[in-house]
């Protein structure tokens, strides 16, 4: 069943398109040599070009072009060997030139596609209309002074890739899945870090509603939404607002809006401009951008294994389920961690421990895989202790917690705390004898046919051995000692 919102006049379908602004990973800006490091002192990374000084000419950054091409290739998109930069004219305080250098009619990357997977397991293909390069603007800061707004131009001139989707999404979930998949691809490619909290990936959300089978109605754009969760909330809030207007007999105005997360509503920012309002014309200070086919092919040869291909390989080579492989490939570092641990080991055992206790401790301690005190080598050591029966699974859980809390290796913790599994059959028999003697009534019930009491005896023996008994040996010895139920 497709996603709809029920109004007073029936079901409404959502039509969603996303324009994602992804900051290019590059040491310098798109048209100047100024640095791009996040968090630098305000206005400490600004060249005369970025500040819009008269007579300063832009010089294209080859690496930014290469990053855009890599991204296009990663999106299975058409690379345009000839593209052109244009001036997009508008006034804003943090745009010192009075125009933005962008690409309008002739973008560097054409049509492509992304396949997304929903929680239900259903897959959908979302079309990519285009990717173009453009300059970012500076940043207006309204909370630094009681009566003035301040401008930080560090971001001015930083290279952005604007990745425009087709209006193919029909629910907040699909939009969220699209953004997560796009961010994962960009991170694998190394072309954008995807850190929405730092502003290096931002989304403009286009939303309209219609009855099933109708043509598209008027859309509104929600600007600069900076988290996937907020994108999903903004879509639902804006769709409900538009439905109320249509059902009341009104019309939706094409406009740009902002999302207020605290109130869960969108509010009007300005009337939505059309392309002619920006008076686009070819950038006179830059020649058309002409790429050689051989150069594009050389970039294609450097592409890493992308998420979909990696997932298929993990399923094939390691016997993982689609769900397990999908979790691991969401972040390249997670997939690499898994492969390192799984090399030469039982892959299903590794997957179970990573998806269970290991991820749980990452969440508990607020650490990432990169900063975790439990490295791939150390997790592998712990799993080896389970495999060779030095410790059992219950003890291993305790050891893993101690590894996170102390930073010590598994072997050192097991030795220091005397946690080695007991495999001495004499010690196991002695523990069983004590438990049986203390629970004569339970033994009588077991002998009378209450077979579930076998688990009780196993638990009591393990408790008597402080969890160190080898479970298989305990089960074997217990069956030998107390026999079958009802016997």
Curated annotation (Swiss-Prot):
The keyword Metal-binding does not apply. It is an enzyme of class 6 (ligase). Its EC number is 6.3.5.-. This is Aspartyl/glutamyl-tRNA(Asn/Gln) amidotransferase subunit B. Gene3D superfamilies: 1.10.10.410, GatB domain, N-terminal subdomain. GO terms for molecular function: asparaginyl-tRNA synthase (glutamine-hydrolyzing) activity; ATP binding; glutaminyl-tRNA synthase (glutamine-hydrolyzing) activity. It holds the Pfam family GatB_N. GO terms for biological process: glutaminyl-tRNAGln biosynthesis via transamidation; translation. It comes from Acidiphilium cryptum (strain JF-5). Coiled coil: none annotated. InterPro entries: Asn/Gln-tRNA_amidoTrfase_suB/E, Asn/Gln-tRNA_Trfase_suB/E_cat, Asn/Gln_amidotransferase, Asn/Gln_tRNA_amidoTrase-B-like, GatB, GatB_C_1, GatB_Yqey_C_2, Gln-tRNA_amidoTrfase_suB_CS. Keywords: ATP-binding, Ligase, Nucleotide-binding, Protein biosynthesis. Allows the formation of correctly charged Asn-tRNA(Asn) or Gln-tRNA(Gln) through the transamidation of misacylated Asp-tRNA(Asn) or Glu-tRNA(Gln) in organisms which lack either or both of asparaginyl-tRNA or glutaminyl-tRNA synthetases. The reaction takes place in the presence of glutamine and ATP through an activated phospho-Asp-tRNA(Asn) or phospho-Glu-tRNA(Gln). Heterotrimer of A, B and C subunits. NCBIfam families: gatB (TIGR00133), PRK05477.1-2 (NF004012), PRK05477.1-4 (NF004014), PRK05477.1-5 (NF004015). It catalyses: L-glutamyl-tRNA(Gln) + L-glutamine + ATP + H2O = L-glutaminyl-tRNA(Gln) + L-glutamate + ADP + phosphate + H(+); L-aspartyl-tRNA(Asn) + L-glutamine + ATP + H2O = L-asparaginyl-tRNA(Asn) + L-glutamate + ADP + phosphate + 2 H(+). Belongs to the GatB/GatE family. GatB subfamily.
